[in-house]
């Protein structure tokens, strides 16, 4: 049986950026077509998967750039997505050794927590929701959205495991 040749670091980085770019495109091309209250956050999946492959400083820069892409489309809440993505990416990079194992349940939990933290930060800093609408969003739609995002992340990680493996 012939084993696969070892991959270079440049090939691993190129595959990771390809995966991130595809998730970025899905966030802006597929997500608007499925416009519901509980959306899958493809960009958050990309940011989390990129953050576990990098150090906290670079993860924060990736989060900032992803947040600026989102903030450019919502001038009323400019900076809210950037702040949320930076915090989530930084924290994800810090706890990667604990949560990003080769275990499906831990990966799902990692994405759920990341999505909940992102939504809490984004909604509280954007200032768009108040009162019962805020409670409904945080208590009903955020957990549903987090579960859907985690489900998609698990499916993507299972299908494209070599692309997102942290050590590859």
Predicted regions and their residues:
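Terminal, non-globular segments
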Residues: 1-168
């Amino acid at each position: 049986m012939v084993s696969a040749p070892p991959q270079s670091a440049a090939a691993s980085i190129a595959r990771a950026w390809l995966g991130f770019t595809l998730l970025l495109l899905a966030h802006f091309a597929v997500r608007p077509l499925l416009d519901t209250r509980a959306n899958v956050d493809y960009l958050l999946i990309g940011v989390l998967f990129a953050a576990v492959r990098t150090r906290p400083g670079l993860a924060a820069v990736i989060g900032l750039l992803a947040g600026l892409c989102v903030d450019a489309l919502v001038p009323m809440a400019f900076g809210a997505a950037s702040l949320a993505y930076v915090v989530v990416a930084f924290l994800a990079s810090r706890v990667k050794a604990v949560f990003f194992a080769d275990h499906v349940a831990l990966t799902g939990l990692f994405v759920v927590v990341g999505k909940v933290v992102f939504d809490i930060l984004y909604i509280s800093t954007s200032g768009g929701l108040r009162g019962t609408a805020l409670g409904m969003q945080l208590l009903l739609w955020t957990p549903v959205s987090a579960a859907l995002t985690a489900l998609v992340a698990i499916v993507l990680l299972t299908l494209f495991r070599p692309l997102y493996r942290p050590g590859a």
